[in-house]
C-alpha cells in the first residue's frame, strides 16, 4: 500500500495505556473507509483525520480531505461514527494545519473560515479536538506575531469554547526551505513563546499537539517541557528527526533546516523514545499518540 508500508504491523490490541494511531494525510489516495479499515486491520486504535478543504494542496500532505466538513451533517456524522465503532477505531482529532496569520488577507480569511467549519465538525462528531497551527506572518518578528495571534485567535477560541472543542497547536516551525524563510509559518515553536501565547490567550481549550522531533534540529530539550506544560498537552505526535552533523558543520544552523536534517519515522532518528514515553506517562498523559508524516 503506497506511503503506508512502514506503518503495517501485526500488533494486537492489548489495552495499552497509550492508544496508537496516525494522521490520515499519509494515505491521501484512499477513502476515509479504506483508512479506517487499514487502521483496524493493523492494530491502530485511533486516527487524526485530515480535513483540508477540497482542492489543490499548497504543500505536501496538505489538501487531504478524508472528512468533508463543508457538507457534514448529523446523518453523515452518525454514519462516520458507526463505521469507526464497528471497527474499534476512534477519531482522536480533526486535523487542519493552515496559516491563519498569513500576510495575505484573502488566504487568511479562507483559512479561518474553514477552521471554523472544522471546529463545528469536531463538535458534531463528538471528537471535541482540532489539531492545527497557530500560524505566523513569516516577515514579522516574534513580538508583532504575538500581537497578531492574540487578535486573530481570540474570536476563534471563543467560537471553539462555545462548542466545547479543544484546539491543539503543533510546535512545527514550518521552516524547512527558502519558501518559508525567514521566520517560518508557525509561531508556536518554543516554551518561551508558548508561555506568552497562553498568557495572552488564557483559554482552557487551547493547548499543544506535542511533537518532539522539531526540538531535535533546533537543539532544544524536548523532555523538560513535558513537565512544565503537562496540563496543556492535549495531543501527541510520533515523528523522528535525524541530524546530519557533518552537513550542519558545513552549512551552519542558520541554513534552511532540510539542508542538514531529515524527518523520519520513529526509531530512525535522534529522539529517545523510551525516555519520551516514560515522561509522558509520569506526567499523567494517558491518551493518544500518533505517527505523523515523515515529510
Q: What are the functions of these language-model segments?
A:
Residues 275-288:
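Short glycine/proline-rich, acidic loop/turn segments that cap or connect secondary-structure elements
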Residues 48, 93-95, 131, 168, ...:
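Conserved beta-strand positions in the central sheet of alpha/beta enzyme cores
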Residues 18-20, 30, 144, 150-270, ...:
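Acidic/histidine-rich catalytic cores of soluble enzymes
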Residues 122-142, 168-178:
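Active-site groove signature of glycoside hydrolases
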Residues 23-27, 50-54, 96-99, 135-137, ...:
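Active-site beta-loop-alpha junctions enriched in small/polar residues
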